[in-house]
């Protein structure tokens, strides 16, 4: 074809300079250093550190496991939607982060489903605003869960309906009753992932 290429062509690391600093920058990312702190530590310009952050995070986004095996735990996490940087807010501003105007789970919160197996393979899916539904679970979980997996969740009705329709073994742990562990069934791995 007459074109030149190398192993990095077509990847997020293509055409980046200072290859000797990449591992040190990855360590800065893992240590949750700010862009300016990383730039100061590596002696590069802050714009370079900012561009690198986006390139490295693109790599992390594509590095996901293909399938969960064995015992898989699933739980949902609700976060307030951030409109930081938006020129036109769709709601009144929340000063200093704040809290939702409505109590409980509402359309102000984004639902994130986290599924994790006992080997540590973790997948997360943004399902939308408001309460979790079985339709949202059907959209994200079937491609990444084996048919012979045991799905362990809390008592949410959407998981029960999804597992029944998908033909997946399901066991619910009744957290409201104070039962956190039933033999090998618990959702502590995925809840620990939430707390990070």
Residue ranges and their predicted role:
Residues 1-196:
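Residue-level recognition of single "structural anchor" positions
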């Amino acid at each position: 074809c007459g074109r030149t290429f190398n192993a990095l062509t077509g990847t997020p690391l293509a055409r980046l300079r200072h290859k000797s600093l990449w591992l040190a920058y990855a360590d800065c990312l893992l240590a949750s250093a700010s862009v300016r702190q990383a730039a100061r530590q590596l002696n590069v310009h802050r714009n370079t550190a900012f561009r690198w952050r986006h390139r490295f995070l693109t790599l992390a986004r594509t590095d996901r496991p293909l399938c969960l095996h064995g015992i898989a735990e699933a739980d949902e996490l609700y976060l307030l939607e951030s409109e930081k940087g938006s020129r036109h807010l769709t709601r009144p501003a929340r000063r200093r982060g704040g809290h939702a105007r409505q109590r409980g789970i509402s359309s102000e919160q984004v639902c994130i489903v986290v599924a994790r197996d006992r080997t540590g393979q973790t997948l997360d899916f943004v399902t939308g605003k408001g309460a979790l539904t079985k339709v949202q679970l059907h959209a994200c979980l079937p491609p990444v869960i084996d048919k012979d997996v045991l799905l362990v969740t809390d008592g949410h009705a959407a998981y029960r309906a999804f597992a029944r329709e998908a033909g997946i073994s399901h066991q619910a742990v009744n957290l409201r009753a104070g039962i956190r562990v039933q033999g090998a069934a618990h959702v502590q791995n995925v809840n620990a992932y939430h707390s990070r």
